Each structure stands twice: as structure tokens, then as C-alpha cells.
Amino acid sequence: MSKKALLMILDGWGLGDQKKDDVIFNTPTPYWDYLMNNYPHSQLQASGENVGLPDGQMGNSEVGHLNIGAGRVVYQDLVKINRACADNSILQNPEIVSAFSYAKENGKSVHFMGLTSNGGVHSSMVHLFKLCDISKEYGIDNTFIHCFMDGRDTDPKSGKGFIEELSAHCEKSAGKIASIIGRYYAMDRDKRWERVKEAYDLLVNGQGKKATDMVQAMQESYDEGVTDEFIKPIVNANCDGTIKEGDVVIFFNYRNDRAKELTVVLTQQDMPEAGMHTIPGLQYYCMTPYDASFKGVHILFDKENVANTLGEYIASKGLNQLHIAETEKYAHVTFFFNGGRETPFDNEDRILVPSPKVATYDLKPEMSAYEVKDKLVDAINENKYDFIVVNFANGDMVGHTGIYEAIEKAVVAVDACVKDVIEAAKAQDYEAIIIADHGNADRALNEDGTPNTAHSLNPVPCVYVTGNKAAKVEDGRLADVAPTILKIMGLEAPADMNGQILIK
């Protein structure tokens, strides 16, 4: 039997420990309580390996909506590369083979550059160590490492320890630390080309403070009051590790935003006014796709094409769908939900409600929830859509402020909106699944009572609003939502979706 389906995503609405830190539990939510008492519900895992992230890593809205829409676990870049390093399949990666074979056959140097820290946001030391090992295996003596120091995703003076770790690994593997510079210069993303020039001059022209002991040079920088992020260019005086014509460069950052500008000046665009010119014949490898417009660069781990998402599949059946959210979460119910696709599918309507223009959302905890609700109720009453997905942003966006009283107000607003939407949906014969993409408002305090502004690792709810009194809903993970929606709609899930159907 086929029904129209409504998928409601309450952003940041996890299932907490029901103690003081759990604002959702501690705030009066009469309609949520009614749903819990009258409809089948279960828990979904929304973090770590269940959503394609490393074990123990909290989920986020981008990853959450990607998994929800895909109907399968979508492995994130970090996990894909970790796996390739662990099972040695990286050795068969055709781009790795081409890079190291070319260097060996042509007597060229190999350069690894990237953020040298264990912050886990832009790069991984594990990947760098593996690259050193591959260089050793190919017998490439001229292997140079250019270290961009962190201090943002790590402690501001942790960099010296990372340089020590890397030096120790190079002793038994391959590679020499040729240069060091702070990410402030090497990883700018705001077109401050004068900063990028500092990194360019270091890498290409060997301009910087000469040092024979790179660990000692880090300590000297600290002694001068300059911490990791802002480390001025340091050159290893014991070797010439500058990047030359025809060399191999592997930029081992897997996150793209702060890897673009340096890539531009080395490979894409001459900037004579800034004294920066691209290097002829450079064999340049990016860990992941940094920018679709880049020409002549190699990509070690290409973007996974997520085909047959929930939105695409519903469109292929000639059905009508609506995606609605306020600005803060609009990209999540469109671009991410549709597998990283910007353009709407056939018969896919979108409603964007502007988020309020306030400095921080504790100043307006209800955000634009009531406006989203009003537009959604109107759309439901049009009786035009076979499938609707909506996101209410409050639990997450107000949760990030860490201000308890504001989060309480956000929860109250969401509860009121859920009521109006679900009652309208029931009246128009929709069945609804209510979930969250990850937790946040369910853990507003740390153990010591200080505000917690981060996402939680808690599971999230899955409520099945149906007229079928015998219905049950099983525990699962976010990847199980799309096949479950299709079941409600009387459609068989495509083979690409390996998530489980949760309703029985």
C-alpha cells in the first residue's frame, strides 16, 4: 500500500542521558511526549563508522544529510584514505604508481606538503607516514617534506612534538623535513596573496630562516612568542629541498578549502604582480579534488558519485517532491541530501525561508521555525507532493551557542512546529518519519557544568507516525531512512541503497 511520505529532520535533536545536560528532556515538550506515547519509535546511530566517519567521531549535518538521502553509508574522505593506508591498497592506486614511477625513472625529487598535525580536520600524519614508506619502497632518495604547522585544530605549541615524531619516522623510512611554515601563510583561504607568497617563496625559492635542527628551530620560534599557526618560514640548511621544474608534489591535505590557493599559484595561474609563477612540468597530486576548475593536476582519491539518492529515485518515478528549510540548513536538505548535487531533480520544488539576521541565535532561539512551519503546512494542504523533507534548524544552531535558556526556548518552538506540521500531514493522509541528523541540544553541559557547544555522540530518535496500530520501527542508522521512506511510498529501494527497512 502506498502513501505520501513526510520526512522531518530535527537538527541537533539527539536522545540524551535525561540528566541536567539534556535540555530536550528537561524542557516541557507536550507534543513530543504525545508522539512518544502514541507512535512506534526507535533509535538511529548518527556518528562514527555508522555514517562513514572514523570510530568515535561525532556526526555533523553535512554527513548526516548525505547518509539520510543516500540510503547507504557514505564513507568520508578520511575513512577512505585510512582504509587504503591500512590495507595497503594505496600501493595499487594508479595515481600513486604514476607519481613514484615517474620520479624514479626521471631522477626527480618527490615533495610531500600539508598540515603536519594530528588535528584530523585537514590532514592525517598517518597518511604522511605512509607516503614516506612508499618513497622508501621505490628507493627515492630525494624525498622532501614541507610541514605546515597547525595550532588551530591542535594546541598552539604541539607542533614541535609533531616535528619530532615525523623526524623519528623519517629515520627508519624515507624523507627529510625541508621546510616549516605556519598554516596562517600556507593555508590561507581568503585570497590574502601576500600570506601565500611567504609559503611560495619558501617552497620554490628557499627563502626563510636557515636551521640545521628543525626541532630546535620550532623551540626558538616558541621562545620568540610565535606559535604553530604563525611560524615564520624555516629552511633546512642541510639540504636543498626547493620545488623545481618537473618535480613531483603531493599535497596530502584531504580537505579542500585551505589547499586551493597554494595549488593555484604553483600550478594554475601566474601572479607576476605578486612575484609568483607556476612551475613548468610539475607533476602535482592532490589528495582529493580541491576544485573542479583545476587543470592538469592529479587526484589520488576522487569524489565518490552518490547515484540513486532518495530524491533522484523519487524523481525517476515521475513523483513530486518538496525540500524545505531555513537558510542555515537549506544546503543540507538540497545539496547534501541529493548526494552533492546542486541542481534540483525533475518535479522537485524547493522552499528557502531566510534565517533571522542576528549575530548569534541565542538572540532569537525560535529562528525562522514558525515561518518554515507555516509554508510547510500550506504545501501539505495543497496535496501536490508525494514526498516532503523538512529540516528544523533550532536544536543545532541554538545548541551551538551553549546558552541553556536559549536552547530551552528553541526546543519549545520546535515542539510547537512539529505539532502543527504533523497534524496537517495526518489530515492529508501522509505518513511521517521524524528523525535527527545528529545530537546537540541533548547535551548542553559538560561534566564540570560548563556549556558544551559541540555535537553529541548520542543516538537520535526515529518516530513513525502512522495510522497502523500494529506498526513497529526497529533501531538502525541514518542510512536506513531512505529505504524506509520508499517502503512507506510503496516503492522498492534501488540496488544502490543497502540500508535496511526499519518499519514492520
From Swiss-Prot:
Pathway: Carbohydrate degradation; glycolysis; pyruvate from D-glyceraldehyde 3-phosphate: step 3/5
Gene Ontology cellular component terms for the protein in this record: cytosol
Record-listed E.C. numbers: 5.4.2.12
Swiss-Prot/TrEMBL catalytic activity: (2R)-2-phosphoglycerate = (2R)-3-phosphoglycerate
Protein name per its UniProtKB record: 2,3-bisphosphoglycerate-independent phosphoglycerate mutase
Enzyme class: isomerase
UniProt record similarity statement: Belongs to the BPG-independent phosphoglycerate mutase family.
Cofactor(s) needed: Mn(2+)
Any Pfam family hit: Metalloenzyme
Molecular-function GO terms, alphabetical: manganese ion binding; phosphoglycerate mutase activity
Sites where the protein binds Mn(2+) 1: 396, 400, 455
Organism: Bacteroides thetaiotaomicron (strain ATCC 29148 / DSM 2079 / JCM 5827 / CCUG 10774 / NCTC 10582 / VPI-5482 / E50)
NCBIfam families: pgm_bpd_ind (TIGR01307)
Cofactor note: Binds 2 manganese ions per subunit.
Sequence positions that bind Mn(2+) 2: 11, 61, 437-438
GO biological process, one term: glycolytic process
PANTHER family: 2,3-BISPHOSPHOGLYCERATE-INDEPENDENT PHOSPHOGLYCERATE MUTASE (PTHR31637:SF0)
Catalytic site: 61
Assembly description: Monomer.
Binding site for substrate: 122, 152-153, 183, 189, 255-258, 329
Keywords: Glycolysis, Isomerase, Manganese, Metal-binding
Role summary: Catalyzes the interconversion of 2-phosphoglycerate and 3-phosphoglycerate.
